[in-house]
Curated annotation (Swiss-Prot):
One of its GO terms (biological process) is positive regulation of bicellular tight junction assembly. Effector cytokine of innate and adaptive immune system involved in antimicrobial host defense and maintenance of tissue integrity. Signals via IL17RA-IL17RC heterodimeric receptor complex, triggering homotypic interaction of IL17RA and IL17RC chains with TRAF3IP2 adapter. This leads to downstream TRAF6-mediated activation of NF-kappa-B and MAPkinase pathways ultimately resulting in transcriptional activation of cytokines, chemokines, antimicrobial peptides and matrix metalloproteinases, with potential strong immune inflammation. Its main location: secreted. Pfam families: IL17. The lineage of its organism: Eukaryota, Metazoa, Chordata, Craniata, Vertebrata. InterPro entries: Cystine-knot_cytokine (IPR029034), IL-17_chr (IPR020440), IL-17_fam (IPR010345). It comes from Bos taurus. The gene is IL17A. This is Interleukin-17A. It is found in: Secreted. It comes from the Eukaryota. GO terms for cellular component: external side of plasma membrane; extracellular space. Belongs to the IL-17 family.
Amino acid sequence: MASMRTSSMSLLLLLSLVALVKAGVIIPQSPGCPPTEDKNFPQHVRVNLNIVNRSTNSRRPTDYHKRSTSPWTLHRNEDPERYPSVIWEAKCSHSGCINAEGKVDHHMNSVTIQQEILVLRRESQHCPHSFRLEKMLVAVGCTCVTPIVRHLA
């Protein structure tokens, strides 16, 4: 989870930097610069992918996936054509939820919690340093919900 959190934070910082540069907030634009709304404004920027602050000072329990009433396991999703190349995704351990006695209760449903993230996708194999932004839906955990019951009339 810490690796996934670090990757998510680095992408968030990267996207914030791109947005600030495009808006001209970080680098003041001289009067001769084209406005960002101009169709001739460049759609490409150079970004250094080295993360400045990889360590975080927050110490949180990392066993939520085991203690939850809807436990999950983490599976490695690896794609060398994507940055970050490794993203950890959750998979619910049961279709039902764990009750107070520690047994699976099939009157409740375990469902994944999904988060949309932005990743960098390699443009082509011929240009290894060229990436484009891509949305990706990632399962980050599971939760317990009441089932949807449909009554036939």
